[in-house]
Amino acid sequence: MFIAFEGIDGSGKSTQLVLLEKYLINRGKKVIKVREPGGTILGEKIRDLLLNFNMNKRSELLLFLASRAQLVEEVIRPSIEKGYFVLADRFSDSSIAYQGGARNLGKDLVEKLNIFATNGIFPDIVFFIDIPVQMAVRRMKEKEKDRIEKEGEDFLEKVRTTYLHIAKSRKNFFVIDGTKDVDYVFSQIKRIIDTMLDH
């Protein structure tokens, strides 16, 4: 099974991914974690470029897609074939929300390019950890920000709006209230996962 965690920066998605990893391991499942951009030697080099160098929005999108294509072929596809649970800290919907929505490159264009980059491999479940932008900004105040995190509140509002728009059209895209405490948020995720595992 392939599960992706999405959210604006500061949403707590990475914390929830770690909690799910521990939970699945305790249930005897084989688990592998990946992050985007990154997760391969090439992907980590691309990550450095994306987070630290200025570039135009088309270059940004294509670099994310290159990292994703490599990650699918090197890690995600082989892991799924071996029966692992693959947990991704961001995947294709990040490009739809950030580059398609907030950068105005267009949702349809990014969706088509995602199909090409992933060779049609997409998550079985997506958990979007949703929090208001102002809460995300407060949470990120303590942290050193990368290039994309420095974009500001208007940019993040566009990202969040695009994610919520995606949720309306996909049955496997679950919006989780990230404003609650960590344990409560995880209980919502666990309930959905348990339903999937018990079928």
Swiss-Prot record:
One of its GO terms (molecular function) is ATP binding. Keywords: ATP-binding, Kinase, Nucleotide biosynthesis, Nucleotide-binding, Transferase. Pfam families: Thymidylate_kin. The keyword Ligase does not apply. ATP binds at residues 7-14. Belongs to the thymidylate kinase family. This is Thymidylate kinase.
